[in-house]
């Protein structure tokens, strides 16, 4: 086994060790799901960033930069502004509100704030979270197969199986304590990858005389996507839709349950201001760096190379080609870190939706804290295996990580984003308005994503968010008698 493989295995052993070490800290359901609301600003910020930027950032975004080109830069801009908006609009108020209502989850917070005696908010929220997170977690498992295929030349199915097993085991053992503290290290590895790899690539390219502009021009004829155009070769209204489609990635940050739960777990609302600065400082070079990794790989290998090699494997391939094996091993571990950080967080949030919101609260099962924690661990295995099955299916069908993540991101962001923003900032928001927003965001995403004519017109990330926001607003105005 080479040096890269040794470093990778040592890193995975470390993750499992953290899971064993943090097992003893989980005495209550609040400990298991929110780390007892005791996280400091640095851990919170890095955990939010590491779990927010999944394998999508280190695998799918570079792949999109290669095959789509400069028009994907709108997504980079949208993501950065979405992160900033989430920290300013959601973080501090949500931390205060969830403690005020003694809520461990987003469904529970919305239920208690709007005094939903019907339990419809809790039920709808739980279904939405469980449904879309199965796809989202499956994308992370799928990504593990791609990285391990690149690293060890393993069959992708074997890689998916290994990655899924590791994530399920250490999330099962450590809960949110394990997730948050490993996210701190993984966030450091990820930002190191996204800053150093493009710089190393640029130095290599400058010495060879190759340029990004020439490679983008060549990619135009290879991928047929007008790669050298910021608007994909379109003009007028079509160009505007292209830009808005990329920018719409930012809207999802307002409602991703696995991200906003970090705001709920921070030690105090005062720590939010410090964590916000750290997270934004991470995002600016991190998101931009991922896009540059794709462009550097395009120049270094040439567009034709990616007709036979998966563009979503460009980051690990580039790291192995340019860097010392020790550094390459760390950075490829960073790619797996990105996948694990998101998958473990999503497994926890999905589990909380089933055990805390549905079983404990909706069905009214009065269980001890010890039994609730055990039930949560059982659900992690069940949901993890379901996501594993979807990942295997995606690999067999040849689906891209980019598309699966976009679908789940849209569904979660549009269902919860408008509901959370309005609940935190608009006093006229009503219970029925929240229910309408959840339902419209959920259904619009599913319908829009599965009708090619609508999807070709505008992405579901934008349409579903707008319709859900309007639903909350209009229905709330029509039901002011209950506010």
Model-found features: residue ranges?
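Membrane-embedded helix-loop-helix hairpins and adjacent transmembrane boundary segments
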Residues: 1-483
């Amino acid at each position: 086994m080479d040096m890269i493989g040794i470093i990778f295995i040592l890193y995975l052993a470390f993750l499992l060790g953290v899971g064993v070490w943090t097992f003893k800290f989980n005495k209550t359901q609040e400990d298991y799901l929110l780390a007892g609301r005791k996280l400091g600003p640095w851990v919170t910020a890095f955990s939010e960033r590491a779990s927010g930027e999944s394998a999508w950032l280190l695998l799918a975004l570079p792949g999109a930069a290669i095959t789509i080109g400069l028009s994907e830069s709108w997504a980079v801009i949208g993501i950065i502004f979405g992160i900033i908006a989430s920290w300013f609009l959601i973080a501090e108020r949500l931390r205060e509100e969830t403690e005020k209502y003694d809520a461990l989850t987003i469904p529970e917070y919305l239920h208690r704030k709007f005094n939903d005696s019907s339990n419809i908010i809790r039920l709808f929220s739980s279904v939405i979270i469980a449904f879309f997170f199965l796809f989202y977690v499956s994308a992370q498992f799928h990504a593990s197969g791609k990285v391990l295929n690149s690293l060890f030349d393993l069959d992708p199915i074997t890689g998916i199986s290994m990655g899924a097993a590791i994530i399920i085991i250490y999330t099962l053992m450590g809960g949110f304590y394990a997730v948050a503290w490993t996210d701190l290290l993984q966030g450091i590895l990820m930002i190191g990858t996204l800053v150093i790899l493009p710089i190393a690539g640029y130095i290599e390219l400058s010495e060879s005389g190759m340029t990004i502009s020439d490679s983008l021009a060549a990619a135009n004829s290879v991928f047929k996507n007008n790669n050298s155009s910021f608007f994909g070769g379109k003009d007028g209204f079509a160009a505007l839709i292209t830009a808005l489609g990329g920018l719409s990635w930012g809207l999802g940050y307002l409602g991703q349950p696995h991200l906003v739960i970090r705001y709920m777990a921070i030690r105090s609302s005062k720590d939010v201001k410090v964590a916000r600065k750290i997270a934004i400082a991470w995002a600016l070079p991190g998101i931009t760096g991922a896009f540059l990794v794709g462009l550097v790989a395009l120049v270094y290998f040439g567009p034709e190379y990616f007709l036979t090699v998966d563009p979503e494997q460009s980051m690990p391939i580039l790291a192995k080609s340019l860097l010392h094996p020790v550094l390459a091993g760390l950075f490829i571990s960073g790619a797996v870190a990105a996948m694990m950080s998101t998958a473990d967080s999503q497994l926890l949030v999905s589990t909380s939706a089933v055990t805390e919101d549905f079983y404990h609260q909706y069905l009214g099962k009065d269980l001890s804290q010890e039994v609730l924690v055990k039930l949560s661990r059982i659900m992690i295995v069940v949901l993890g295996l379901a996501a594993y099955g979807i990942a295997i299916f995606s690999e067999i069908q040849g689906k891209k990580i980019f598309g699966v993540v976009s679908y789940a991101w849209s569904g979660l962001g549009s269902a919860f984003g408008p509901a959370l923003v309005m609940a935190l900032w608009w006093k006229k928001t009503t219970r029925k308005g929240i229910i309408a927003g959840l339902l419209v965001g959920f259904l619009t995403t599913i319908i829009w994503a599965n009708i090619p004519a609508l999807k070709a017109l505008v992405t579901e990330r934008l349409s579903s968010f707008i319709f859900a926001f309007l639903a909350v607003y209009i229905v709330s105005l029509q039901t002011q008698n209950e506010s």
